[in-house]
Protein backbone atom coordinates (compact mmCIF):
# COMPACT_ATOMS: atom_id res chain seq x y z
CA UNK A 1 0.00 0.00 0.00
CA UNK A 2 1.50 3.39 -0.95
CA UNK A 3 2.41 5.75 1.87
CA UNK A 4 0.47 8.98 2.41
CA UNK A 5 2.98 11.79 2.75
CA UNK A 6 0.37 14.55 3.06
CA UNK A 7 -2.89 15.29 1.19
CA UNK A 8 -1.36 18.42 -0.40
CA UNK A 9 1.39 16.40 -2.09
CA UNK A 10 0.09 12.84 -2.49
CA UNK A 11 -1.44 13.51 -5.91
CA UNK A 12 1.03 16.09 -7.15
CA UNK A 13 1.84 19.64 -6.17
CA UNK A 14 -0.28 22.62 -7.18
CA UNK A 15 1.79 25.72 -7.88
CA UNK A 16 0.94 28.70 -5.68
CA UNK A 17 0.41 32.32 -6.72
CA UNK A 18 3.45 34.58 -6.19
CA UNK A 19 1.06 37.51 -5.61
CA UNK A 20 -1.23 35.69 -3.19
CA UNK A 21 -2.63 38.24 -0.69
CA UNK A 22 -3.17 35.84 2.23
CA UNK A 23 -6.32 34.66 3.95
CA UNK A 24 -7.72 33.08 7.08
CA UNK A 25 -6.78 29.81 8.75
CA UNK A 26 -9.46 27.91 10.67
CA UNK A 27 -9.38 25.20 13.30
CA UNK A 28 -11.35 22.03 12.56
CA UNK A 29 -14.19 22.61 15.03
CA UNK A 30 -17.65 22.38 13.40
CA UNK A 31 -18.60 25.81 14.81
CA UNK A 32 -17.02 28.69 16.76
CA UNK A 33 -13.80 28.13 14.85
CA UNK A 34 -10.56 29.74 15.92
CA UNK A 35 -9.74 32.08 13.03
CA UNK A 36 -6.24 33.34 12.30
CA UNK A 37 -5.79 36.08 9.70
CA UNK A 38 -2.63 36.04 7.57
CA UNK A 39 -1.51 39.03 5.49
CA UNK A 40 0.51 37.88 2.49
CA UNK A 41 1.81 34.50 1.44
CA UNK A 42 3.86 32.00 3.42
CA UNK A 43 7.57 31.50 2.77
CA UNK A 44 9.76 28.40 3.02
CA UNK A 45 6.67 26.18 2.83
CA UNK A 46 7.78 22.58 3.23
CA UNK A 47 6.81 19.07 4.21
CA UNK A 48 8.06 18.47 7.76
CA UNK A 49 8.56 15.07 9.36
CA UNK A 50 9.32 16.29 12.88
CA UNK A 51 7.28 14.92 15.77
CA UNK A 52 6.02 18.33 16.96
CA UNK A 53 4.24 19.69 13.87
CA UNK A 54 0.50 19.12 13.43
CA UNK A 55 -0.33 16.56 10.74
CA UNK A 56 -3.71 15.65 9.26
CA UNK A 57 -4.96 12.17 10.12
CA UNK A 58 -3.01 9.46 8.28
CA UNK A 59 -0.27 11.77 6.98
CA UNK A 60 3.41 11.15 7.72
CA UNK A 61 4.33 14.81 7.24
CA UNK A 62 2.94 18.22 7.99
CA UNK A 63 3.13 21.05 5.47
CA UNK A 64 4.31 24.20 7.21
CA UNK A 65 5.52 27.64 6.16
CA UNK A 66 6.37 30.90 7.88
CA UNK A 67 5.01 34.44 7.89
CA UNK A 68 6.34 37.55 9.63
CA UNK A 69 4.88 37.74 13.14
CA UNK A 70 3.31 41.12 12.36
CA UNK A 71 1.37 39.52 9.45
CA UNK A 72 -0.55 37.17 11.76
CA UNK A 73 -3.45 38.04 14.03
CA UNK A 74 -6.08 35.98 15.82
CA UNK A 75 -9.39 37.17 14.39
CA UNK A 76 -11.87 34.98 16.31
CA UNK A 77 -12.09 32.71 19.35
CA UNK A 78 -8.63 33.44 20.76
CA UNK A 79 -9.89 32.11 24.11
CA UNK A 80 -9.89 28.60 22.62
CA UNK A 81 -6.12 28.68 22.00
CA UNK A 82 -3.53 27.13 24.29
CA UNK A 83 0.24 26.71 24.06
CA UNK A 84 0.98 22.99 23.91
CA UNK A 85 4.55 23.06 25.28
CA UNK A 86 5.68 26.31 26.91
CA UNK A 87 9.26 25.03 27.14
CA UNK A 88 9.58 24.39 23.38
CA UNK A 89 11.40 26.89 21.16
CA UNK A 90 8.37 27.02 18.89
CA UNK A 91 5.32 27.63 21.07
CA UNK A 92 2.53 25.92 19.17
CA UNK A 93 -0.89 27.49 19.67
CA UNK A 94 -3.58 24.84 19.27
CA UNK A 95 -7.35 24.81 19.64
CA UNK A 96 -8.28 23.35 23.05
CA UNK A 97 -11.33 21.64 21.53
CA UNK A 98 -10.20 20.06 18.24
CA UNK A 99 -6.42 20.02 18.79
CA UNK A 100 -5.55 21.74 15.51
CA UNK A 101 -2.32 23.74 15.59
CA UNK A 102 -3.07 27.24 14.27
CA UNK A 103 0.38 28.80 14.55
CA UNK A 104 3.77 28.44 16.21
CA UNK A 105 5.62 31.45 17.61
CA UNK A 106 9.19 31.80 18.86
CA UNK A 107 9.63 34.16 21.81
CA UNK A 108 13.20 33.26 22.79
CA UNK A 109 16.47 34.33 21.17
CA UNK A 110 16.45 32.19 18.01
CA UNK A 111 17.35 32.52 14.30
CA UNK A 112 13.65 32.36 13.35
CA UNK A 113 12.32 34.73 16.03
CA UNK A 114 9.87 37.08 14.36
CA UNK A 115 8.50 34.38 12.06
CA UNK A 116 5.32 32.47 12.83
CA UNK A 117 4.88 28.89 11.61
CA UNK A 118 1.53 28.15 9.97
CA UNK A 119 -0.30 25.39 8.11
CA UNK A 120 -1.79 27.09 5.03
CA UNK A 121 -3.93 24.00 4.34
CA UNK A 122 -6.21 25.27 7.13
CA UNK A 123 -7.32 28.05 4.79
CA UNK A 124 -10.28 27.92 2.43
CA UNK A 125 -8.32 30.01 -0.10
CA UNK A 126 -6.14 28.62 -2.88
CA UNK A 127 -2.85 30.16 -4.00
CA UNK A 128 -0.57 29.69 -1.00
CA UNK A 129 3.06 28.90 -1.81
CA UNK A 130 3.49 25.25 -2.70
CA UNK A 131 5.91 23.07 -0.69
CA UNK A 132 9.53 23.82 -1.60
CA UNK A 133 11.32 20.85 0.02
CA UNK A 134 10.91 18.10 2.62
CA UNK A 135 12.71 18.51 5.95
CA UNK A 136 13.36 16.29 8.94
CA UNK A 137 12.54 13.29 6.77
CA UNK A 138 14.26 10.66 8.94
CA UNK A 139 12.31 11.87 11.96
CA UNK A 140 9.29 9.84 10.87
CA UNK A 141 11.23 6.72 11.94
CA UNK A 142 11.24 8.02 15.53
CA UNK A 143 7.45 8.17 15.31
CA UNK A 144 7.10 4.52 14.31
CA UNK A 145 7.62 4.48 10.53
CA UNK A 146 9.65 1.42 9.51
CA UNK A 147 13.16 2.33 8.30
CA UNK A 148 12.80 -0.06 5.34
CA UNK A 149 10.21 2.29 3.85
CA UNK A 150 12.44 5.37 3.76
CA UNK A 151 13.64 4.84 0.18
CA UNK A 152 10.00 4.85 -0.96
CA UNK A 153 9.31 8.07 0.99
CA UNK A 154 12.36 9.86 -0.44
CA UNK A 155 11.61 8.59 -3.96
CA UNK A 156 8.04 9.84 -3.74
CA UNK A 157 9.20 13.32 -2.70
CA UNK A 158 11.82 13.36 -5.45
CA UNK A 159 9.22 12.33 -8.04
CA UNK A 160 7.30 15.46 -6.98
CA UNK A 161 10.40 17.60 -7.49
CA UNK A 162 11.07 18.07 -3.77
CA UNK A 163 14.54 17.62 -2.34
CA UNK A 164 14.66 15.72 0.95
CA UNK A 165 16.75 16.75 3.95
CA UNK A 166 17.19 15.39 7.44
CA UNK A 167 17.35 18.95 8.74
CA UNK A 168 16.13 22.01 6.83
CA UNK A 169 17.00 23.18 3.32
CA UNK A 170 20.55 24.54 2.75
CA UNK A 171 19.42 28.22 2.60
CA UNK A 172 17.65 27.88 5.95
CA UNK A 173 20.60 26.05 7.50
CA UNK A 174 22.87 28.84 6.18
CA UNK A 175 20.58 31.39 7.85
CA UNK A 176 20.85 29.55 11.17
CA UNK A 177 24.65 29.28 10.86
CA UNK A 178 24.93 32.99 9.95
CA UNK A 179 22.83 33.93 12.98
CA UNK A 180 25.03 31.77 15.21
CA UNK A 181 28.25 33.16 13.68
CA UNK A 182 27.10 36.73 14.35
CA UNK A 183 25.98 35.88 17.87
CA UNK A 184 29.30 34.29 18.82
CA UNK A 185 31.34 37.08 17.17
CA UNK A 186 32.79 35.00 14.34
CA UNK A 187 30.92 37.03 11.69
CA UNK A 188 30.36 40.76 11.40
CA UNK A 189 27.06 41.92 12.86
CA UNK A 190 26.64 44.03 9.71
CA UNK A 191 26.71 40.98 7.43
From Swiss-Prot:
Zn(2+) 1 binds at residues 27, 29, 95, 98. Its EC number is 4.4.1.22. Binds 2 Zn(2+) ions per subunit. It catalyses: S-(hydroxymethyl)glutathione = glutathione + formaldehyde. Zn(2+) 2 binds at residues 48, 50, 53. Keywords: Lyase, Metal-binding, Zinc. Pathway: One-carbon metabolism; formaldehyde degradation; formate from formaldehyde (glutathione route): step 1/3. It comes from the Eukaryota. GO terms for molecular function: S-(hydroxymethyl)glutathione synthase activity; zinc ion binding. Its cofactor is Zn(2+). InterPro entries: CENP-V/GFA, Formald_GSH, Mss4-like_sf. One of its GO terms (biological process) is formaldehyde catabolic process. The keyword Lyase applies. The keyword Ribonucleoprotein does not apply. Pfam families: GFA. HAMAP family: Formald_GSH. Catalyzes the condensation of formaldehyde and glutathione to S-hydroxymethylglutathione. This is Putative glutathione-dependent formaldehyde-activating enzyme. It comes from Aspergillus oryzae (strain ATCC 42149 / RIB 40). The lineage of its organism: Eukaryota, Fungi, Dikarya, Ascomycota, Pezizomycotina.
Amino acid sequence: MPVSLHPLVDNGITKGDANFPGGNLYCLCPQNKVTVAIKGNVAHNHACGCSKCWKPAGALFSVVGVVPKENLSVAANADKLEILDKAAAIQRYACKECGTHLFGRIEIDHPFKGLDFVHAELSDKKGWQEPQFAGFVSSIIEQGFHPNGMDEVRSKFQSLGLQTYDTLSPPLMDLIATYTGKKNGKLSANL
